[in-house]
Amino acid sequence: FTAKASSDDTRFGVSLCRSTDVKKYYSLIVNPEWANGRRKINFEQEGEGGKGFIEGADGYIFPRPADNVYNVDIYTDNSVVTMYINGVYGYTQRIYGTQKNCWSINCYNGQIEISNLSLTQY
């Protein structure tokens, strides 16, 4: 999918393993880390039983796209999830339960416009 952020500091991500009765779920969040336009993909445990940011499980720093357009690709084999931003910047995490539960695209501040959403199964 493509996400167009409304501002330089928009924070958004994808949540996985979101069932109707879960007290915690996992998210890969594109987070503005510094005022100079650098971003990082953070791994967070959200929900009422979640821990929030999981220290030591975050991604590498990458530059904010000048036009605030993020082309996001997510691949999974049902236990390992890899997220790519603009075909270059990636993050991989083992997350069990992705094949049995709902996913969501979230915006935590600002706004995002989603387009080109495509799902493929092999």
Which positions does each model-derived feature cover?
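Beta-rich accessory regions
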Residues: 1-122
